[in-house]
Amino acid sequence: MIIDRIHSDFPNAKIGILGIQLPCPNGGITSCYGASGYYHDWYGETVTALNYNKFLEEKCKLDKYKDYCKYFDTKAQFDVEYNYWTKDMKVNNRSEVVERIGINGIHPSLDGYNQIGDSFYRALVEMLKH
């Protein structure tokens, strides 16, 4: 595992492990590619992300890693409604009313990546204080 290798080469290093954000609830999960399987829908992707984050958090708490690994919970700080790519679309052919629809529910927008960076930076600063 890469964590073991880093710790072996740099035994005094602290390692921050960043979780992943939840998918966009406004759609867009499969708009950019042809996904199939349990992860191609919003619910399936959300459950997968939650399980993956739980795995990372529990890994960091193991006796083997707890002294030098810290899990950073991005999902708690990421705005899933407004930090993915979206476009405004008419709600139907007879109405001029528009709604925001996700066009990529997996990869954040530039603002979303900046928000992830901000959360990582805050967690990293806090980790280095201790």
Regions found by a protein language model. Give the residues of each.
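Solvent-exposed, polar/charged alpha-helical surfaces in well-ordered, non-transmembrane soluble domains
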Residues: 1-4, 8, 50, 54, ...
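Hydrophobic, aromatic-enriched interface-forming segments
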Residues: 2, 20-24
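A short helix->loop->beta-strand "cap" motif at the edges of active sites that frequently abuts
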Residues: 10-14
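Mobile gating loops/cap/lid regions near enzyme active sites that modulate substrate access
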Residues: 22, 34-37, 69, 74-104
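Substrate-gating cap/lid alpha-helix
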Residues: 25-75, 110-111
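Histidine-centered active-site loop/cap adjacent to the catalytic His
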Residues: 93-130
